[in-house]
From Swiss-Prot:
A single MF term (Gene Ontology): misfolded protein binding
Region (Disordered): 280-300
Coiled coil keyword on record: yes
Name listed for the protein in its UniProt record: Clusterin-like protein 1
Organism field: Bos taurus
Superkingdom of the organism of origin: Eukaryota
UniProt xrefs under PANTHER family: CLUSTERIN (PTHR10970), CLUSTERIN-LIKE PROTEIN 1 (PTHR10970:SF2)
Protein's UniProt keywords contain Coiled coil: yes
SMART domains: CLa, CLb
């Protein structure tokens, strides 16, 4: 026996093709013999079921494509995470090496502290680090080294601030990635289950479908384009993102393709610093003669760059003192300046890797949310057809008229322009439609009206995931 829904829908389509309004005799037969009315059309295929099956097929196709995209995103995300861990490991190794070298350096430079600390406090140092970018790096290195010596000499100034354990952060990331994988995996299972149910419905009704539709529905989803993709768009401006196409470009792999660059030598910085000092000395001479270099340029929060020019001899003495401190540093702690540079670059690498991991994570989450949204919309639109899979051959009609109640009298008011029709949808549920006569027996739109109401009822009562 054909699936019950086919009995009713085929009959509806046959009547709609006739394009003729029912007569008074037809109205009597509808009221007196509803079962005969429901059996009248067992010829054509149910277009609503066919449309829903097409939707379920496309749902499967779209989910498979989303699975591929999700896999690429997750591979990229995990690679980013690995690279972030490597960057952090590198930074820790450099920091440990630096701390060891600093311990060796502290004792040897203790005697130089009193002589070199004035270099760090000089107005000329503030001038050089403000107006000459090359000096900033060198000053930072010297200052960091001698501050550590100061902390060594005066332990109560030691900075006890420590970072949070890294292990806790990575554990949180593990949980986050696992949650994403679990949600997507469950969504994949749910979509697969719905498609299998719809395939069962297709097999029950296969003989009623044309060969072209059978060929499409049975085809490999990777080798044939679907009939259409329904345009399910989210509300305006919801989850707007520049990467919404979700075609995974190759540049994702470049996000985490990190490697250490060749560290700049400290000697190059020193050379630039000395050159800047010579240039400044020339500018001071020009300023003494009223040259153009006497013009001052304000620097936000640092005063005027022209201030030290008023006492060039003091700055030249400052240069000599700092040069001596630099010589001490190079002689007693040759590895420390370079390790400071490496530590700075390793920290920058960690920061970049954290940012890029966060970007890919955000894209992965958006992709999951968009996929969930699309699957839910397609399930709401087409998933009702899977309810028919529970009907076995030989069961009662899914769509059938049980009774027709003519006009109802309420006091002095007569509702003879309406009729009540009880319709059975599946053995477990009945519902009643109140249909105006002009929209039923006397109208050629009666079949379309009934069909729309029945499908709407199915969708409204179709259970969620």
């Amino acid at each position: 026996m054909k699936p019950p829904i086919l009995v009713f829908i085929v009959y509806l389509l046959q009547l709609r093709d006739c394009q003729c309004a029912p007569t008074g005799k037809d109205r009597t037969s509808i009221r007196e013999d509803p079962k005969g009315f429901s059996k009248a059309g067992e010829i054509d295929v149910d277009e609503e079921v066919k449309k829903a099956l097409i939707g379920m097929k496309q749902m499967k196709i779209l989910m498979e494509r989303r699975e591929e995209e999700h896999s690429k995103l997750m591979r990229t995300l995990k690679k980013c995470r690995e690279e972030k861990q490597e960057a952090l490991k590198l930074m820790n190794e450099v920091q440990e090496h630096l701390e060891e070298e600093e311990r060796l350096c502290q004792v040897s430079l203790m005697d130089s502290w009193d002589e070199c600390k004035s270099c760090l406090e000089s107005d000329c140092m503030r001038f050089y680090t403000t107006c000459q970018s090359s000096w900033s790096s060198m000053k930072s290195t010297i200052e960091r080294v001698f501050r550590k010596i100061y902390q060594f000499l005066f332990p109560f100034h030691e900075d006890d601030e420590k970072e949070l354990p890294v292990g806790e952060k990575f554990t949180e990331e593990d949980v986050q990635l696992m949650q994403i994988e679990n949600v997507f995996s469950q969504l994949t299972v749910d979509v697969g289950f719905l498609y299998n149910m719809s395939f069962h419905v297709f097999k029950q009704m296969q003989q009623e479908f044309d060969l072209a539709f059978q060929s499409y529905f049975m085809s490999d989803t990777d080798s044939m384009e679907p009939y259409f993709f329904p345009a399910f768009s989210k509300e305006p401006a919801k989850k707007a993102h520049p990467m919404q196409s979700w075609d995974i470009p190759s540049f994702f792999q470049l996000f985490c393709n990190f490697s250490l660059s060749v560290y700049q030598s400290v000697s190059a910085t020193v050379t630039e610093m000395l050159k800047a000092t010579e240039d400044l000395s020339k500018q001071d001479k020009d300023s003494a003669h009223g040259g153009p270099s006497s013009t001052t340029w304000p620097v936000r929060g640092r005063g005027l760059c022209g201030e030290p020019g008023q006492n060039s001899s003091e700055c030249l003495q400052f240069h000599a003192r700092c040069q001596k401190c630099q010589d001490y540093l190079w002689a007693d702690c040759p590895a420390v300046p370079e390790l400071y540079t490496k530590a700075d670059e390793a920290l920058e690498l960690v920061n970049i890797s954290n940012q890029q991991y966060a970007q890919v994570l955000q894209m992965t989450q958006h992709h999951l949310e968009d996929t969930t949204y699309l699957m839910e919309k397609m399930r709401e639109q087409f998933g009702w057809v899977t309810e028919l899979a529970s009907q076995t051959p030989g069961s009662e009609n899914i769509f059938s008229f049980i009774k027709v109640v003519p006009g109802v009298h309420e006091g002095n008011f007569s509702k003879q322009d309406e009729k009540m029709i009880d319709i059975s949808i599946l053995p477990s549920s009945n519902f009643t439609l109140t249909i105006p006569l002009e929209e039923s027996a006397e109208s050629s739109d009666f079949i379309s009206y009934m069909l729309a109401k029945a499908v709407q009822h199915f969708k409204e009562h179709f259970k969620s995931w």
